Amino acid sequence: MPAYKRVLLKLSGEALMGDDAFGINRSTIEAMVNDIAEIVKLGVQVAVVIGGGNIFRGVAGGAAGMDRATADYMGMLATMMNALALQDAMRHANIEGRVQSALRMDQVVEPYIRPRAIRQLEEGKVVIFAAGTGNPFFTTDTAAALRGSEIGAEVVLKATKVDGVYTADPKKDPSATRYTTISFDEAISRNLQVMDATAFALCRDQKLPIRVFSIVKPGALKRIILGEDEGTLVHV
């Protein structure tokens, strides 16, 4: 019996690279889609917000000297490429994925329309939200918090390459330990980089919990949906 009826899955663009240095690793994206298919079969309504850092990041070195708003719009276009790749992989897995974009690109994808997105979720389709919030200076983490709040998701599932939130960077500090649960306020006071501050504040204000987990850990997503202890739960 699923613990959640409707979830917002946040996928980072970097996670799509797999072991590659850039771009989209096909086997990695197929593995992600298989994980999503597992929970769709359980009757869970799934929406996805996808990043673009595997292609372009508005705040990264490649954007040095560039107008920040222009760089952010380029990052939004990168998320569109990832969203189309994810939708295509879903089609091969017999899942109907619908891409809705915060920036209009009508020949390619639908515009973001909240009632339509909710209806598609209720029909069992996976809705992929592209182009972040459609505004520069806002991250795709903030888009995940915003869209999760708008569609009435019960939890934001933040898929990363580490299996939760740690007391310190586990790659740099071998003594770092993982939190199983932590409050928003404690995470803020300890300056734990779960999400950027805007996304974090929005989730806290909307009482929308965040579960941080490893997308590369086999079966992790399904275990979360079944209510098992996986990753770190950030709560009010």
Curated annotation (Swiss-Prot):
Notes on how activity is controlled: Inhibited by UTP.
Keyword ATP-binding appears in the UniProt entry: yes
Entry's localization field: Cytoplasm
An annotated GO BP: UDP biosynthetic process
Pathway info: Pyrimidine metabolism; CTP biosynthesis via de novo pathway; UDP from UMP (UMPK route): step 1/1
Superkingdom of source: Bacteria
GO cellular component: cytosol
Cited InterPro entries: AceGlu_kinase-like_sf, Asp/Glu/Uridylate_kinase, Uridylate_kinase, Uridylate_kinase_bac
EC number: 2.7.4.22
The entry's keywords: ATP-binding, Cytoplasm, Kinase, Nucleotide-binding, Pyrimidine biosynthesis, Transferase
UniProt keyword ATP-binding, yes or no: yes
Residues bound to ATP: 10-13, 53, 57, 160, 166, 169
Reactions the enzyme catalyzes: UMP + ATP = UDP + ADP
Sites where the protein binds UMP: 52, 72, 133-140
Molecular-function GO term, any one: UMP kinase activity
Function: Catalyzes the reversible phosphorylation of UMP to UDP.
Family matches, as HAMAP family: PyrH_B
Subunit note: Homohexamer.
Family: Belongs to the UMP kinase family.
Protein's name according to its UniProt entry: Uridylate kinase
Organism from which the protein derives: Cupriavidus necator (strain ATCC 17699 / DSM 428 / KCTC 22496 / NCIMB 10442 / H16 / Stanier 337) (Ralstonia eutropha)
